Amino acid sequence: MVEPLLAGIVLGLVPVTLAGLFVAAWQQYKRGEEVG
């Protein structure tokens, strides 16, 4: 019964983690663009 829960957690966390990394990279890019 633990495996479906674990799979749900992983499937929930992976898109959130990717979205967080994408947003951080985009903010850094925009900040660099403003400075340049």
UniProtKB/Swiss-Prot annotation:
Tell me any Pfam family this protein matches: PetG
GO: which molecular function terms?
A: electron transporter, transferring electrons within cytochrome b6/f complex of photosystem II activity
Which GO CC terms are listed, alphabetically? cytochrome b6f complex; plasma membrane-derived thylakoid membrane
Question: What are the entry keywords?
Answer: Electron transport, Membrane, Photosynthesis, Thylakoid, Transmembrane, Transmembrane helix, Transport
- Membrane disposition: Single-pass membrane protein
Q: Which GO terms describe its biological process?
A: cytochrome complex assembly; photosynthesis
Location (main, coarse): membrane
**According to its UniProt record, where is this protein located?**
Cellular thylakoid membrane
Superkingdom, taxonomy of origin: Bacteria
Bilayer-spanning residue ranges: 5-25
Q: What does this protein do?
A: Component of the cytochrome b6-f complex, which mediates electron transfer between photosystem II (PSII) and photosystem I (PSI), cyclic electron flow around PSI, and state transitions. PetG is required for either the stability or assembly of the cytochrome b6-f complex.
> What quaternary arrangement does the UniProt entry report?
The 4 large subunits of the cytochrome b6-f complex are cytochrome b6, subunit IV (17 kDa polypeptide, PetD), cytochrome f and the Rieske protein, while the 4 small subunits are PetG, PetL, PetM and PetN. The complex functions as a dimer.
Query: What does the sequence similarity comment in the record state about its family?
Result: Belongs to the PetG family.
Q: Which HAMAP family match?
A: Cytb6_f_PetG (MF_00432)
* Protein name in the entry: Cytochrome b6-f complex subunit 5
